[in-house]
């Protein structure tokens, strides 16, 4: 089988879609040496992403950094590469695909946030998504997604038959492990002035409910006076004025720290040393940090919204993400009731066994095998 994969998010500093692409693509190549793989990049790439002798890698012009260049890359460069290589199937793990390619296509859709919450996206990118994403959903021969919530959402929102959509849950990457108490103390000394801390990781953006989280933390500090900090790891995204305002108005500003991008070697340690992960996002397709927290034996406070209850199971304290009071009460519950927090950890040890990159990769491979067609030679 000749499998072409869109690997443009395999960048030097892996984030989000890059990690997803890495975890799936490396397993496909390693577990199926009998198959040939074509990795399609949109710029120069690192050799570590060529996972084996059965992988051919191409950098296609242009670097797809803008909606007009996305169109050029997917509708001109990609179809030509697929045709010349004789691909039997094209897999796109980032919710984009080529409408002009004559090859059977499978894509992963992680969520429909661009359709449901377009106000959080720059204007031109928003228009691109609103026009093309519905077309992509109907063009794909099969759609993979990362939760049953998103599967149902695609069917309802885009009118795609459920038989064309299947779920392959994300897994947790290697390195997320519990720490010994002395190691936790080292992390707290480095990042939190030696204090316990609540932790958030992800984009710093209003869609992630960061303004309410900051105000809820402020409430928690006022009510309890607890010697606890709030650490937020992640890049500042577009439209962060509301986040900045919430921070500037916080009475506990000295105990709130924006860490920016955290190296992949440090993120598991920050997660493992946290008092709890605070993940009260308004909209998610999976909520990977919750699974990472479960693997580090860290309690989770999560939003009772979208896919998060499905992924969290009984491993998280679920709260109303629109209520700052409810979030603050959740923080207080975890801070004051350590027996309850340990119960969340125990539940997380069981819940995390439901999610595996190995299982996800094999499901995706079976979908590709069923979808593959005669290589396009036209």
Describe each model-derived feature in a short phrase.
Residues 1-378:
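Carbohydrate transferase catalytic cores enriched for Leloir-type hexosyltransferases
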